[in-house]
Amino acid sequence: MGCILTIEAKKSRDIDYQLRKEEGSKNETKLLLLGPGESGKSTIFKQMKIIQDDGGFSIDERLEYRYIIYGNCISQMKVLVTAAISQDLKPNNPDNETRFEKFSKISPGGNSWTLEIAEDIKQLWSDDSIQNIYRMKDKFYQLNDSAAYFFDNIGRFANENYVPTQDDVLRSRVRTTGIQEAHFKFINIEFRMLDVGGQRSERRKWIHCFDSVTAVIFCVALSEYDQTLREEESQNRMKESLMLFDEIVNSHWFRNTAFIIFFNKVDLFREKIAKIDLGDYFPAYTGGLSFDNSTQFIKKMFLDLSTGNQRIFAHFTCAIDTANIQFVFHAVRETLLKNIFNTIINY
């Protein structure tokens, strides 16, 4: 009996040690966050800052996002106005004609922000022509997922004492270029997470991140099954995700690496799948406008790509929902513990 307890205690100590150990002297578990552009990777990355032990963005850190948020408001209204003009839509309110002209020429960065610009955005967002063109998003033009959130909150942003909230920070968008790195502790385990640019031009920078990875978290935007790439408008976004996952999961770099798929933007997908049939873009799907049927079909498409023996775990996520990501990351932590336990007992 004492011998069994000693063996079990040793295994427990080994698991604890291995989970904290990375190659060399670093006491961290290395997570590689991969996926195509706009799959929600960077939002997941920011969530880690919030859900970590004693986490969250400080006031000073949130203030640094102000001009990013201002820039998001301006750039997304410019997209809408440009799309409206291209479709020959005129503003309902004659006063907005000059605003159409202004936003067709405006520089989209946060440096263009003024209280007058904030009022322009408020008036344009309430115009029927802009609302009509907004409903055409994903068909004729590409708009960020959080555009409506920013427009709805424009009055708050215009306050001279405005301090971004955690939600504002999560919804803000800056294209990831190169490699972003963060160190955080979650339930007493040290993690090192690397977020790399998802656009095609950024993927060549991934290669040197592949060494000593404990797990790959691969993000897929469920809601983009009917959308095309910004870089190549003839390529379906979900098909691009499938191609990328196929390349990564079957790479020799990851033969012994755990894979965790985050099927992200589940909230947007639930709204869209009730109106737009997945079968229009993936003819093998015959499950109709069913959320359950469509999510299981998509999940199977990805899981079937693996030709190796890796264990692949899947979670349906909403990256802007902190409670959801905290719940999912508890499961991810348990997955890593079990993976290391299985490695030790099979050693």
From Swiss-Prot:
Location of region: G2 motif: 168-176
Magnesium is among the record's keywords: yes
Gene Ontology terms: biological process: adenylate cyclase-modulating G protein-coupled receptor signaling pathway; chemotaxis to folate; G protein-coupled receptor signaling pathway; regulation of aggregate size involved in sorocarp development; response to bacterium; sorocarp development
Keywords, comma-separated and alphabetical: GTP-binding, Lipoprotein, Magnesium, Metal-binding, Myristate, Nucleotide-binding, Palmitate, Transducer
Region G5 motif: start-end pairs: 317-322
Domain annotation G-alpha: ranges: 27-347
Ranges for region G4 motif: 260-267
Molecular-function GO term, any one: GTP binding
GO cellular component, one term: heterotrimeric G-protein complex
Binding site residues for Mg(2+): S42, T176
Lipid-modified residues, N-myristoyl glycine kind: G2
Binding site for GTP: 35-42, 170-176, 195-199, 264-267, 319
Residues with a covalently attached lipid (S-palmitoyl cysteine): C3
Region spans: G3 motif: 191-200
Superkingdom in the source lineage: Eukaryota
InterPro entries, per database record: Gprotein_alpha_su, GproteinA_insert, P-loop_NTPase
Pfam families to which the protein is assigned, alphabetical: G-alpha (PF00503)
PROSITE patterns: G_ALPHA
Complex formation: G proteins are composed of 3 units; alpha, beta and gamma. The alpha chain contains the guanine nucleotide binding site.
Family statement: Belongs to the G-alpha family. G(q) subfamily.
Protein name (Swiss-Prot/TrEMBL): Guanine nucleotide-binding protein alpha-5 subunit
Species, as recorded: Dictyostelium discoideum
